[in-house]
Amino acid sequence: MKNVLRIVAGLFGAFFLISGLQWIIAPGSIAEQLGMPLLEGVGLSAQIGDMGSFFITVGVMTLIGVLTQTRHWFYAPSMLLLVAALYRTLSAVLYGAPFVMSAIIVEVVVGLFLIFAGPRIATED
């Protein structure tokens, strides 16, 4: 069971890491995949910086948790994902943004998975 959890967490980590790298390598492509336009000016800087750092952080911290088998590495990426889902929901409720159920489901499922898997993968604290 532990190795299955490590493999799944590793796949999630790799996915987020690759997505984060795409924000530097091909920002137009990853923006399109996420259903958003590539912004211009200061917006472009914020979009690449914020989105890239989000995905890189989730990916790298998850992979460090998988490789070191240390549970605390899974908590920050989980929090980032769950708060992103919360803010997506609030943006829809408060400001009329589209409710992107598919993204919210991914963020909640992966975020909760990391909370579940962390202690089961860990060999140390």
What are these regions (language model features)?
Residues M101-F113:
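Small-residue-rich transmembrane alpha-helices that serve as helix-helix interface/gating elements
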Residues F15-V42:
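Hydrophobic transmembrane helix segments
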Residues G43-I64, M79, V83:
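Core segments of alpha-helical transmembrane spans in multipass integral membrane proteins
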Residues V110-D125:
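Membrane-water interface at the C-terminal end of transmembrane alpha helices
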Residues T70-L80:
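Membrane-interfacial loop-to-transmembrane alpha-helix junctions, especially the N-terminal start
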Residues M1-F15:
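Cytosolic juxtamembrane helix and N-cap/initiation of the first transmembrane helix
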Residues F16-S19, L80-L90:
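Aromatic-anchored segments of alpha-helical transmembrane domains
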Residues L86-S102:
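Membrane-helix boundary connector in multi-pass membrane proteins
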